[in-house]
Amino acid sequence: MSATPSRTPHLDRVTGPADLKAMSIADLTALASEVRREIVEVVSQTGGHLGSSLGVVELTVALHAVFNSPGDKLIWDVGHQCYPHKILTGRRSRMLTLRQAGGISGFPKRSESPHDAFGAGHSSTSISAALGFAVGRELGQPVGDTIAIIGDGSITAGMAYEALNHAGHLKSRMFVILNDNDMSIAPPVGALQHYLNTIARQAPFAALKAAAEGIEMHLPGPVRDGARRARQMVTAMPGGATLFEELGFDYIGPVDGHDMAELVETLRVTRARASGPVLIHVCTTKGKGYAPAEGAEDKLHGVSKFDIETGKQKKSIPNAPNYTAVFGERLTEEAARDQAIVAVTAAMPTGTGLDIMQKRFPRRVFDVGIAEQHAVTFAAGMAAAGLKPFLALYSSFVQRGYDQLVHDVALQNLPVRLMIDRAGLVGQDGATHAGAFDVSMLANLPNFTVMAAADEAELCHMVVTAAAHDSGPIALRYPRGEGRGVEMPERGEVLEIGKGRVMTEGTEVAILSFGAHLAQALKAAEMLEAEGVSTTVADARFCRPLDTDLIDRLIEGHAALITLEQGAMGGFGAMVLHYLARTGQLEKGRAIRTMTLPDCYIDHGSPEEMYAWAGLTANDIRDTALAAARPSKSVRIVHSA
């Protein structure tokens, strides 16, 4: 009996990028189809970023066929689109561990493979990194060509333009691939561009634009208009030069990002002839080749496990509303009551829940694109004008606007409402998206009020509190995922600033929790009570200002005080310690422990796995409290790896 033929005969021959060098265009095209099928099969079982990776399959194959990774440095912006790159660089056998604990990352990661030249996760960093590699080569380091692959969304960020400007000034040989997946090129335009690129291969780069303009003059009206539209995004300078040419780049394109022959030939010729910085404008279709993705509004950008035939995602039935939706709904309700409320997001209206308000009040919700620096100061300006701006950002992206928070918001004491989504550990996106540092950054800023929601009902109260707070900037952090299933108020209440609440009363150990780990504190208290340790659990609610009356009471009435938070060192626990040191209460003989995230970056896994590794489970809290209150009692403290 003969063996069943492989469904991936071309991919089976690939152990690394070198295996692509001898393949024909037909073989490379077939390889791309097999890679695309493999990505769909893998992500259907693991979840992940599907649409972006499907859109760059041909481009990735062509890049590895032309360039020589890892000597040549392929630098993927954001990294959502790196799955075909990982498959072709020796990690195919591990793809089913994608984003799982102990498995491969969903982003490029230097420690994972020499083919991952530069780590990613946040946007608009690739051109800067590629230029750094190029300068390293010029100064004698063993670096080949450097290639930044950046999307049409990421290139709108200020950092990308700063890098383009510097690269054009230095004239270093490097390549920027603009992956434009928001433009459709009709077949005649594709044919035109094939002809224009033929001219480019026969003449200096500078002749390309003039040739394009000359040809366009003689095309039929609809085709001529299509050709001009294809260049419209980048052609806006006096004299018809592209923005990139004005910045010092040679510009090639648009190129059909799904035509293997055109891609390979363009890359080969450009690589052979370039002496300075070159931008190649490649047009792709996000979700290409998988009908459910191409038909979805978001092109199945980020997905959970799904059915391959239908594309339907296999999501578990939630036990409680998720925090993001609660925020979006309650903010929309407040906006209906107060016309001064506006909202700002940096390219994440759905991810932050602002799409709910956007549907009802479209003129009062502003998506500024990938521009957190601008978003912060834009919100500050609106606050200065008398509006009530709610700026919703993921915790890990708050970092990108920190100087503006210091200089434009806190220093001027402007009432910007900073809504910090994805606070704490977020799971499969791993270290690049962990919300670990926002409290450490904000709690030390004069004028700022910093809150954290312990559950979804508290989130309701805190949204209302933020809306009513006009005396300065206020931040509210809350985690990813569903809430605890608590009873929800019809409308939130305005909380007293700087006042916490006591959840359970005890006499021996006090656990002072800040944020959504309150549930773990309450579980730990039950364990401690079962062992005869009388335990108080309090919800601080505020990190700045601290509830000093509550802290005094906990110190006076207990042998041990444990602070608990879902953030890095230097946050809530540090603020409590500073207060105790300042008031001389560290000399009272109490055992004091701070429980924070460890001093390291935590790799991807489920949130439960990550918090276990971090030593922040209910068992860890119980062990820490027991060791502090009764040091003579033998306690085994286990941090799960």
UniProtKB/Swiss-Prot annotation:
Pathway: Metabolic intermediate biosynthesis; 1-deoxy-D-xylulose 5-phosphate biosynthesis; 1-deoxy-D-xylulose 5-phosphate from D-glyceraldehyde 3-phosphate and pyruvate: step 1/1. Thiamine diphosphate binds at residues 80, 121-123, 153-154, 181, 290, 372. SUPFAM superfamilies: Thiamin diphosphate-binding fold (THDP-binding), TK C-terminal domain-like. Its EC number is 2.2.1.7. Mg(2+) binds at residues 152, 181. Its cofactor is Mg(2+); thiamine diphosphate. GO terms for molecular function: 1-deoxy-D-xylulose-5-phosphate synthase activity; magnesium ion binding; thiamine pyrophosphate binding. Keywords: Isoprene biosynthesis, Magnesium, Metal-binding, Thiamine biosynthesis, Thiamine pyrophosphate, Transferase. Homodimer. NCBIfam families: dxs, PRK05444.2-2. This is 1-deoxy-D-xylulose-5-phosphate synthase.
